Swiss-Prot record:
Disulfide bonds: none annotated. Its main location: cytoplasm. This is ATP-dependent protease ATPase subunit HslU. It comes from Syntrophomonas wolfei subsp. wolfei (strain DSM 2245B / Goettingen). NCBIfam families: hslU, PRK05201.1. ATP binds at residues 18, 60-65, 279, 344, 416. The keyword Heme does not apply. Belongs to the ClpX chaperone family. HslU subfamily. Gene3D superfamilies: 1.10.8.60, P-loop containing nucleotide triphosphate hydrolases (3.40.50.300). ATPase subunit of a proteasome-like degradation complex; this subunit has chaperone activity. The binding of ATP and its subsequent hydrolysis by HslU are essential for unfolding of protein substrates subsequently hydrolyzed by HslV. HslU recognizes the N-terminal part of its protein substrates and unfolds these before they are guided to HslV for hydrolysis. It is found in: Cytoplasm. The keyword Cell inner membrane does not apply. The gene is hslU. A double ring-shaped homohexamer of HslV is capped on each side by a ring-shaped HslU homohexamer. The assembly of the HslU/HslV complex is dependent on binding of ATP. It comes from the Bacteria.
Length: 466
């Protein structure tokens, strides 16, 4: 069971996300409350519901990243959906129940990956045994057919003993050769050898054939219903032993899985640990309108309400309850405000967190401090071309200053501005790096100024290029 304290959760999030301590604290508390709830008696546990969160902040300040990193941290089923893509029942578009079905799919996939990892070693052994069978079949049953149909009952004991001795000798000999072959395969000495294997040919997915027809919205698994009616063809493929091991290990591991148990566990995990991130919630928060593009937004809110407050959604794996799913909504709320949501929906998101716009110092820290910082990413990318690159502290400071300046003068897109600035800054290097193998480059403030100043100072250029 997940036992990190709220402080430890925030420290983990700090490795990837700069600032936004209030938002980190809110999600850390929500996560710790799930752990606390699991320790309670059954009667009380059912009565405690998660406190859903609304994150308010402009694009690029870390709303989505906080939720995504949180889910990875606890290995919880997590999906991100855009609220603006849903439509009221009766309009063309996705209905809100599909987010729960997507969560269950994600949860089952997570459980299946864990179960596959648990049986992978056994599956690998079985796969290697199949490869040995292909290379050297174990057939020690060859014997002379009796001429008399009753000879197998009346034949001489001596003749039968001779046949048995010969069969036993051949069986031992083949067994020894198979063991030598098995050891060589296990030591990866025959990886490049080619063998012919039989693999199941996949039939076209029924869900793809009927995509767009709304069949998946009914919670019906046509693939399971009709897939067994289609013949499972096998085709022969010539592959290396390394590739054969991979294919056959997957096949054998699949056979070891109890899919019914995986489906049950996946649904339970989605119900107890699932996180649904509702992005662009502000886009459905506008005032009610009887015509135009806003006509179904109030209806979408009313459709989302029962999902958030707890209901049962029918999926192709079985019913899934949403009572204890954690919902994290997010939006910029530039045009609308949280109070524009219908009151019932506002009440289902009791925790509101405002994320701060990123300052120059925040952008500078984003460039260098996180484990996956942009500077580290570009240095690693160019190192694959045998090109060594480094940035001076002054250059990093100047990049952050220029990115902040563009954000202030044009649309504020937060940390995403750094991506466009860095791409423009390193465009020539990324293009010419294959011809610069072995060189060492230091990106200083002059290099940055030469490539960015003209674009940043020209407001029209910065709007279109950065």
């Amino acid at each position: 069971m997940f036992k990190l304290t709220p402080r430890e959760i925030v420290e983990e999030l700090d490795k990837y996300i700069i600032g936004q301590q209030e938002a980190k604290k809110a999600v850390a508390i929500a996560l710790r409350n799930r752990y606390r709830r699991k320790l309670l008696p059954d009667e009380l546990r059912e009565e405690i519901y998660p406190k859903n969160i609304i994150m308010i902040g402009s694009t690029g300040v870390g709303k989505t990243e906080i939720a995504r990193r949180l889910a990875r941290l606890v290995k919880a089923p997590f999906i991100k959906v855009e609220a603006s893509k849903f439509t009221e029942v009766g309009y063309v578009g996705r209905d809100v129940d599909s987010m729960v079905r997507d969560l269950v799919e994600t949860s089952i996939r997570l459980v299946k990956q864990e179960k596959m990892a648990a049986v992978e070693q056994k599956g690998r052994q079985m796969a290697e045994e199949r490869i040995v069978d292909i290379l050297l079949p174990f057939d020690g049953r060859k014997s002379k057919s009796p001429k008399n149909p009753f000879e197998f009952l009346l034949g001489s004991i001596q003749e039968r003993d001779d046949v048995d001795d010969e069969s036993e000798r051949r069986r031992r000999e083949i067994g020894q050769r198979r063991e030598i072959l098995r050891q060589k395969i296990n030591r990866l000495e025959l990886e490049d050898e080619t063998i012919e294997i039989e693999v199941e040919e996949k039939n076209p997915s029924f869900m793809e054939i009927f995509s767009g027809s709304g069949v998946e919205e009914m919670g019906i698994n046509l693939q399971d219903m009709l897939g067994n009616l289609m013949p499972r063809n096998k085709k022969k493929r010539k592959v290396s032993i390394a590739e054969a091991r991979r294919i056959l290990t997957y096949e054998e591991s699949q056979r070891l899985l109890d899919m019914d148990e995986i489906h049950r566990e996946g649904i339970k995990r989605a119900e107890e640990d699932g996180i649904i991130f509702l992005d662009e919630i502000d886009k459905i928060a506008s005032k009610e309108s009887n015509y135009g593009p806003d006509v179904s937004r109030g209806g979408v809110q009313r459709d989302i309400l029962p999902i958030v407050e707890g209901s049962t959604v029918i999926t192709k794996y079985g019913p899934a309850r949403t009572d204890h799913v954690l919902f994290i909504a997010a939006g910029a709320f530039h045009v609308s405000k949280p109070s524009d949501l219908i009151p019932e929906l506002q009440g289902r998101f009791p925790i509101r967190v405002e994320l701060e716009s990123l300052k120059k110092e925040d952008l500078k820290r984003i460039l260098t401090e996180p484990n996956n910082s942009l500077i580290k990413q570009y240095i690693a990318l160019l190192s694959t071309e045998k090109l060594t690159m480094d940035f001076t502290p002054e250059a990093i400071d100047y990049i952050a200053e220029r990115a902040y300046e563009v954000n202030s003068r044009t649309e504020d897109i937060g940390a995403r501005r750094l991506h466009t600035v860095m791409e423009k800054l390193l465009e020539d290097l990324l293009f010419n790096s294959p011809d610069m193998a072995g060189e060492k480059l230091v990106i200083d403030i002059d290099y940055v100024a030469e490539r960015l100043d003209r674009i940043v100072e020209d407001e029209d250029l910065s709007r279109y290029i950065l």
